[in-house]
Amino acid sequence: SIKNEFWNQIVKRKIENSIRVLEMTSKEEFPISKLTEYINEITDGDSKNREGLAAKMYFRSLFGSDFIRFYDDNVNAALNYGYTIIASAIIRNLAVYGLNTYLGIHHSSKINNFKTLNLRYTIFKIFVDPFLKIT
């Protein structure tokens, strides 16, 4: 379906950006080659959850093998802060052009009013993550 193909492209870009960050910040070849494999394994609508596996490998390669996203620690707080800055800029621009931020694919939630944003800002996380690795 068009929806699944669109989602596949988003997942592919997210993983490609993760590879770029790791290339800038790490000398380890294994995570980069594994993320490249995940791109080639993306199926219709990412039914094999390559996005999730790639994210886990990416964050652990970047911040250490014990790192868990969304824990209550300084790194996660800094990531959330950086992502919020990007998200607010994108929300403003979407609203200016009259786009509906309530629409989304695969990331649905009754409490998340910005589903479209989840599709867009995760692709731009490349602008936040490397700075936390460096500092």
For the regions a protein language model found, what residue spans apply to each?
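Active-site helix-to-loop segments that bind/position phosphate- or nucleotide-bearing substrates
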Residues: S1-T135
